[in-house]
Structures are given as structure tokens and as C-alpha cells.
Amino acid sequence: MKEEKKRALSRLVLTPVQWERSLALHTSFAIGGPARALVQVVNEEELAEVVQFLRAEDIAWRVIGRGTNLVVADEGYIGVIILLKGDFATISICPPTGKTVAATVGAGISLSRLCKSCQERGLSGLEFMYGIPGTLGGAVIMNAGAWGGEISDVLLGVSLLSADGIVDISSAEMNFSHRAWQDYEERWPNAVILSARFLLRPVGQEVVKSHCDSVMAKRRLAQPIKQPNAGSFFKNPVGESAGRLIDSCGLKGLTFGKVMVSPEHANFVVNTGGGTSADIRNLMKEVQGTVFRETGISLQPEVHFI
């Protein structure tokens, strides 16, 4: 990026822009080369101005949360990475209506902080997300879920920054499937989720805490949490478990370079230290090929490659 464009971009935000920032520092896999720039925006005005500038200058860009579902290329990202901070991490609770409460939550909030805030307020509905790394915006796009629950179960709608400005859409207008908002990229190309609205139930702190503790206990028992990973690597096929299929093919512990199919959970790929994006791709292809040959089922990645 030319110096005059760097200066122009820097003037749009309060937080200093980080140039040639390693994305290994911003992804849960701890893998990936540098982005040309990493920009933090703290409100809708900053975001709108940054996006408008990047579009006008034809500079590639994308918003990420905590990089928990991303595999970044070893050569990095030739563009600008945007992080949602400040106002994007707020929670607004409406007065109760009968047995339910509506909450508006910024897209940049971490799922852990959101769940803890709900616990403090005694609001139930999002406990299944407790312990899922990442931020809310990405969770909505992925229709994140676990232990029988998913975002779409309790979502009322979202606010988006689209090419035409801010748009509010209801969950009834959103086509969700397992781990995906299916028509997001088709209907809203390059749109950014600003916030999401949920319908929750006030049940008391102790009830919510009990649910969260139960979910976390299951995670600690079944999932690797000590090594860098991106959570579930493959989508579960209809009526099947990706982890069970991989395990049945004897692939736990399979290693390429410095990445490995976790011995603890077959649908987790872990970075054992110094892994690369190429290692992950090679491991993925081997797992997909073996599972298809032995079961006839084609596994699709849940993670995104950039």
C-alpha cells in the first residue's frame, strides 16, 4: 500500500493501524502470514468510513473476530483485516415481556463474555455457546452451536452494514442450516454484521450457571483445549458425526508436518508447534480421502481458508 493511502487510512480511526501484522497472533490456530494492515474500529462511524475508503481504493478487506474458524495462508493476506472493538462489544437488555427478554448484542463481543453476562443477569438461551472461542458476528454467520443448541434457535435478527447502508433483517429472512447462514454471501456480499438480537428467558443466575458449568465440563472432557486449534474442523454430515467417521478410519494422531488429528477428539486438528497452513491443507486432504474411500462420505471443512 502506498504511503499516501496508509496515511489516509490511519486518519480514519482512533486506534493506530498495525502494518504487516502477523495473523498468527490473531487466529486460534496460531498459523498464518501477515496482513498488509490490521485496523481496529470502535464504532459504526469508523467502520463505515474505513469500508467506504477500502472499496473506493479497491483494496481487499475482511472483518474477523478472534480468528477461531480461520486458516490463514502462510504468505498472509494481501489486504486489510478489520477488528470490531469498543461499541461493538456492548449488550443492551430490553425490559422483560412476559417470560422472555430481548437482548441486542454487538458483533464484536466474545462469546465467553456474552455468556458470562447472561449468567450474571440470569438469562437463559445461550448456554450452549459457553466455552466456544470467537466473537458473535462470526458465530451468527456460522450458525455456531453445540450440545443440541445453535444460534438460529434464539436469534431474532441482525443489523448489517451493507453497500446500501445499515439494514435490519429478521431471522425469518435468514436461511440457516447446520453451521451456516446459507444465503449470507449471496444476499449480502461484503456486508458486516453490526449486532444481533436474541430472545432469552429470565430464569435466575444459579440455573444459568449450572447449565454453563455442565457445558464446560463436557468440553474439557471431550475436546483438546491446551493446543492451538479451530474447534470442530469438519461439518457433521447429515445423521452422522465427522469425529466418529474419522475415528473409525483410525486417523486419530495422523500428523502432517506440525499439525495433527487430535488423539482426544478426531474432529479437532491441533497445531503441535510451528505448524503451517500447508500442513493443515495436506492433513485435511488425507483425512477427506481416507474417509471417502472407506465410507463413501465426503467431509466438508467447517473452517474457512483465506
From Swiss-Prot:
Keyword Oxidoreductase: yes
Keyword Iron: no
Family to which the UniProt record says this protein belongs: Belongs to the MurB family.
E.C. designation(s): 1.3.1.98
Gene3D superfamilies recorded: 3.30.465.10, UDP-N-acetylenolpyruvoylglucosamine reductase, C-terminal domain, Uridine Diphospho-n-acetylenolpyruvylglucosamine Reductase, domain 2
Pfam family, one: MurB_C
Compartment list: Cytoplasm
Catalytic activity, as annotated: UDP-N-acetyl-alpha-D-muramate + NADP(+) = UDP-N-acetyl-3-O-(1-carboxyvinyl)-alpha-D-glucosamine + NADPH + H(+)
GO terms for biological process, alphabetical: cell division; cell wall organization; peptidoglycan biosynthetic process; regulation of cell shape
Any one GO CC term of the record: cytosol
Protein name from the UniProt record: UDP-N-acetylenolpyruvoylglucosamine reductase
Keywords, comma-separated and alphabetical: Cell cycle, Cell division, Cell shape, Cell wall biogenesis/degradation, Cytoplasm, FAD, Flavoprotein, NADP, Oxidoreductase, Peptidoglycan synthesis
Pathway(s) per entry: Cell wall biogenesis; peptidoglycan biosynthesis
